[in-house]
Curated annotation (Swiss-Prot):
Name of the protein: Fatty acid oxidation complex subunit alpha
GO cellular component terms given for this protein: cytoplasm
Functional note: Catalyzes the formation of a hydroxyacyl-CoA by addition of water on enoyl-CoA. Also exhibits 3-hydroxyacyl-CoA epimerase and 3-hydroxyacyl-CoA dehydrogenase activities.
Organism: Yersinia pseudotuberculosis serotype I (strain IP32953)
Biased composition (Low complexity): 599-614
Gene designation per UniProt: fadJ
Length: 753
């Protein structure tokens, strides 16, 4: 790796080693943390390191590397914002970051960033301030500016340096979406100067520093054209229009990003940096950013929990009962994310083949985009095998059942696993409606039976519900949560009652939307009202995507166990008798010229297949909703004459108030353990607007008294189903909130119910 160092300076997170060839190596290694993040106190340390390097008369260059195995810099420490009480405080924080990175940019000898692992947010802004960037050709290496997903913008110069480096259109795309860029793509767009194998990364970076100042690569002609007055004006007009169409005005960070980038290009760097810091300060104090950051911290804290006081049993092999889309999706995330061998059992070879094809196609997309080598695709596929019998299940630690929603069938599956599996094998049912206690009723080892409810498509939806019944052991809970985490899922533990949590709060929302339709409101008016409110798709479109038959199957169970407030309007029976199942058979609320026979129509389909994933650790993800024509024959079928008359506000209030009320009931009945889990479940499971933070944070923002008042007015207008639950009434009377009023969002990880 080269000559040994002759001089070194160490600070808590930064070490400067000067080699005999006069190249300084600055190593970033935040003590006690698994990944590097930039903290406020590091500003002085960086300044001191740079001053000491500047004082070395023979210094030829600097290389910045990470001391962590697979992390360059994962971003700035978001908890810094919690210390900011005003927009001015946050603005000063941004200005301090700008000042430090300006010192790197102005350093008199070349500074090279040697990037391996995550280089995100403030980490990429630091790399952009360097004079050259070399990154490793490794799956763990990604570059991006994800601040928009937290309701912020890059505050340390990212909005100004990136457009000048890669061009304004590519920069806007990166910053507005928060997307992560892979090494080859980063090289192609000019974000990095070279991509090399990890084992020679430092050597190549040192040679680049020795080479002295290099000419900056010219922008492609398309980007140069867009930098001109006419091209720039056209580009920003198009970008602003598309942004507003996607965000519906709910995410002010996106609009501020456009403004700040434009200002820097029009008025020069100083004006751009000043606008960036000011916008960062104002956005940091916005309710949208507070809500999005609360979701980030909530998911982060949840990932550290086991769901139980027990220690999880080691998982070496996983079984899946049932092929098809759901079984294939579960096998896919188990093999490709958890890295565990999977054995699929189906009654016929076609089901197994379909499950195998699911993963082969998913990995094939990565191969075609050069994000994976064909040999790696083959290696991961070898983790999945299948059979029409139970051979191999004697070595399986946990079995995930994904067969039809038939109680006797699932009970038979439990008996089979107890017969053919190991004595310790856990049986996890992917049921969406059947009580886990009934599935375990005939089990010899009921303590090893649990619910594990995935949402479809499994490889895209981040949430799972873990459902223990009264006899489930603590070890079984901990082991099931551990599997979900290995699969890259965010798991919430919920009680074994009808609908669990997600489907239970979704059902009244769907029912009320259907009642609005029966009141004569056009389908598109209902859907547009809820999309404008912030949901990714409207309830009618949702029913078509999930499958009208699938989505309404749980309603009778909810009525039987929870009461008449869950009774579905008669429209569903009429629609189903007409053979309308939604997109999967080309007949639903909307017209489909080319129905997809294998759309998200499995029993556990999610309300939004593009759900909000923080994950990519974040809670805001843009969606492209294709406008489909309404099937107007459905109005004749239902005997209604469509006419917009309710207004978007009334539609939204009727649907969302029922969802909020039911969420509070779930908390009161201990279906969920705390408001945090309820917020995560709603946002990641049904697409509740992330910028509102989830049902419970939204309730706090409205005030319990205002919500109770609104519900009582709705009772007078529409009936007893809007009666506010007692927990909500009590909170209104005592002026209580679900989250502590004076707590910073990063300090609130849960609130006891």
């Amino acid at each position: 790796m080269g000559a040994s160092a002759t001089n070194s300076v160490t600070h808590p997170a930064f070490t400067l080693n000067v080699r005999p060839d006069n190249i300084g190596i600055i190593t970033i290694d935040v003590v006690g943390d698994k990944v590097n993040t930039l903290k406020a106190e590091f500003a002085d340390q960086i300044a001191t390191i740079l001053q000491q390097a500047h004082a070395l008369p023979k210094l030829q260059g600097l290389v910045i590397v990470s001391g962590k195995p697979d992390s360059f810099i994962a971003g700035a420490d978001i908890t810094m914002i919690a210390a900011c009480r005003t927009a001015h405080d946050a603005r000063v924080l941004a200005q301090k970051g700008q000042s430090i990175l300006a010192q790197i940019a102005a350093f008199p000898v070349p500074v090279v960033a040697a990037i391996h692992g995550a280089c995100l947010g403030g980490g990429l802004e630091l790399a952009l301030a360097c004079h050259s960037r070399i990154c490793s050709l490794d799956d763990k290496t990604v570059l991006g500016l994800p601040e928009v997903q937290l309701g912020l913008l890059p505050g340390s110069g990212g909005t100004q340096r990136l457009p000048r480096l890669v061009g304004v259109s590519k920069a806007l795309d990166m910053i507005l979406t928060g997307k992560q860029i892979r090494p080859r793509q980063a090289l192609k767009m000019g974000l990095v100067d070279d991509v090399v194998p990890r084992d020679i990364l430092l050597d190549v970076a040192i040679q680049r520093a020795k080479a002295g100042w290099l000419n900056r690569r010219a922008l492609p002609w398309q980007e140069r054209l867009l930098s001109g007055p006419l091209g720039k004006a056209l580009l920003f007009r198009i970008v602003r229009k598309k942004t507003l169409a996607k965000t519906r005005g709910h995410y002010p960070a996106a609009e501020r990003i456009i403004d700040v980038v434009r200002k820097g290009l029009d008025q020069g760097g100083p004006s751009g940096y000043e606008a960036e810091a000011r916008a960062f300060g104002e956005l940091a104090m916005s309710p949208q950013s507070a809500a999005l950051r609360s979701l980030f911290f909530a998911t982060t804290s949840l990932k550290k929990e086991t769901g139980s006081a027990a220690t999880a049993r080691a998982i070496h092999r996983v079984g899946v009962l049932g092929g098809g889309l759901m079984g294939g999706g579960i096998a896919n995330v188990t093999a490709t994310r958890a890295g565990l061998p999977v054995r699929i059992k189906d009654i016929n070879p076609q089901g197994i083949n379909q499950a195998l094809k699911y993963t082969w196609d998913a990995l094939g997309k990565r191969v075609r985009s050069k994000r994976m080598r064909p040999t790696e695709q083959q290696r991961q596929m070898m983790l999945i095998s299948g059979s029409t019998d139970y051979r191999g299940f004697e070595r399986v630690d946990i079995v995930v059942e994904a067969v039809f929603e038939d109680l006797s069938l699932k009970q038979q599956m439990v008996a089979d696993i107890e017969r053919f599996g190991a004595a310790h094998t856990i049986f996890a049912s992917n049921t969406s409606s059947l009580p886990i206690s009934q599935i375990a009723a005939l089990a010899q080892r009921p303590e090893q039976v649990i619910g594990l409810h995935y949402f479809s498509p499994v490889d895209k939806m981040p949430l799972v519900e873990v459902i223990p019944h009264e006899k489930t052991s603590e070890e079984t809970i901990a082991t099931t949560v551990a599997l979900a985490r290995k699969q890259g899922k965010t798991a919430i533990v919920v009680a074994d009652r009808a609908g669990f949590y997600v489907n239970r709060i979704l059902a009244p929302y769907i029912n009320e939307a259907a009642r609005c339709l029966l009141d004569g409101e056009p389908i598109e008016s209902v859907d547009n009202a809820l999309v404008d409110f912030g949901f990714p798709v409207g309830p009618m479109m949702l029913l078509d995507e999930v499958g009208i038959d699938v989505a309404t199957k749980i309603m009778p169970i909810l009525v039987e166990q929870l009461g008449p407030r869950f009774a579905a309007p008669p429209s569903f029976d009429v629609i189903l008798k007409d053979g309308r199942k939604g997109r999967k058979n080309g007949r639903g609320f909307y017209l489909y010229s080319n129905p997809t026979l294998h759309s998200n129509s499995t029993k556990n389909s999610s309300p939004t297949k593009n759900g909000n994933s923080p994950a990519k650790r974040n809670s805001f993800k843009w969606r492209k909703n294709k406008v489909k024509p309404v099937d107007s024959s459905i109005y004749t079928l239902l005997g209604v004459t469509p006419k917009a008359h309710l207004g978007a506000g009334v539609i939204t209030q009727r649907c969302t108030m029922l969802m909020l009320n039911e969420a509070v009931r779930c908390l009161d009945e201990s279906i969920i353990r705390n408001p945090r889990d309820g917020d995560i479940g709603a946002v990641f499971g049904i697409g509740f607007p992330p910028f509102l933070g989830g049902p419970f944070r939204y309730l706090d923002s409205l005030g319990a008294d205002k919500v109770v008042q609104a519900l009582r007015l709705l009772v007078q207008q529409y009936g007893e189903r809007f009666e506010p639950c007692q927990r909500l009434v009590t909170m209104a009377e005592q002026q209580q909130q679900f989250y502590p009023v004076d707590a910073n969002i990063d300090e609130v990880t849960d609130v006891a119910s």
